[in-house]
Amino acid sequence: MGGKWSKSSVIGWPTVRERMRRAEPAADRVGAASRDLEKHGAITSSNTAATNAACAWLEAQEEEEVGFPVTPQVPLRPMTYKAAVDLSHFLKEKGGLEGLIHSQRRQDILDLWIYHTQGYFPDWQNYTPGPGVRYPLTFGWCYKLVPVEPDKIEEANKGENTSLLHPVSLHGMDDPEREVLEWRFDSRLAFHHVARELHPEYFKNC
């Protein structure tokens, strides 16, 4: 697996992976802007920064130093099932996401990198609510968010060199359930849409 991901896409991934590590605190269920892209080939006036949270977030990134241009260097498009599966396997092969403590900032960096290098609008990486394991709403994305065992959190916070701003030290402040979560690869998610089974209400209009 991999296709186009295995060649040109490797450029920049080690740098982005390191940034995620250091960061401080039209598949099913993509957002409205991605559905626009799928249907019209462009984001329509019904999805603007004033009416769409993902569009507003992207606009705000232009004000920040994110380390790479916010405007994608490839055509804008919605995330598809095949692209989500390929991306999952690419990241598994290259390493860096498996077992990484999740934070919103790290997810933002990943979303922006994918948006910039592949043109996938960043409204697809959403998960089921907690507590417990959070499953991806986008079918084909093979990373779930798994709560970290309390003893592992305690071990990670020992010693004088612990950064108070590292996501593991924030004790889940990013999370509504106050759980510390990590990305975990699960190849079964390419074939079994767990989120749809657990939360069919999220898929009524898909």
Swiss-Prot record:
Location comes to: Host cell membrane; Virion; Secreted; Host Golgi apparatus membrane
- Name the GO terms of the biological process aspect: symbiont-mediated suppression of host antigen processing and presentation of peptide antigen via MHC class I; symbiont-mediated suppression of host antigen processing and presentation of peptide antigen via MHC class II; symbiont-mediated suppression of host autophagy
Q: Which family does it belong to?
A: Belongs to the lentivirus primate group Nef protein family.
Q: What does this protein do?
A: Factor of infectivity and pathogenicity, required for optimal virus replication. Alters numerous pathways of T-lymphocyte function and down-regulates immunity surface molecules in order to evade host defense and increase viral infectivity. Alters the functionality of other immunity cells, like dendritic cells, monocytes/macrophages and NK cells.
Gene3D superfamilies cross-referenced by the UniProt entry: HIV 1 nef anchor domain (4.10.890.10), Nef Regulatory Factor (3.30.62.10)
Chief location: host cell
> How the protein is affected by changing P75A?
Complete loss of Nef-induced MHC-I down-regulation, MHC-I is not internalized
Span list, region SH3-binding = 69-78
Under which name does UniProt file this protein?
Protein Nef
Q: Name one Pfam family in it.
A: F-protein
GO cellular component terms?
A: extracellular region; host cell Golgi membrane; host cell plasma membrane; membrane; virion component
Chain ranges for the short sequence motif Diacidic as given in the UniProt record: 174-175
| Organism encoding this protein | Human immunodeficiency virus type 1 group M subtype B (isolate HXB2) (HIV-1)
Q: What else is known?
A: HIV-1 lineages are divided in three main groups, M (for Major), O (for Outlier), and N (for New, or Non-M, Non-O). The vast majority of strains found worldwide belong to the group M. Group O seems to be endemic to and largely confined to Cameroon and neighboring countries in West Central Africa, where these viruses represent a small minority of HIV-1 strains. The group N is represented by a limited number of isolates from Cameroonian persons. The group M is further subdivided in 9 clades or subtypes (A to D, F to H, J and K).
Induction comment: Expressed early in the viral replication cycle.
Site, Might play a role in AP-1 recruitment to the Nef-MHC-I complex: residue positions:
M20
Site location (Cleavage): W57, L58
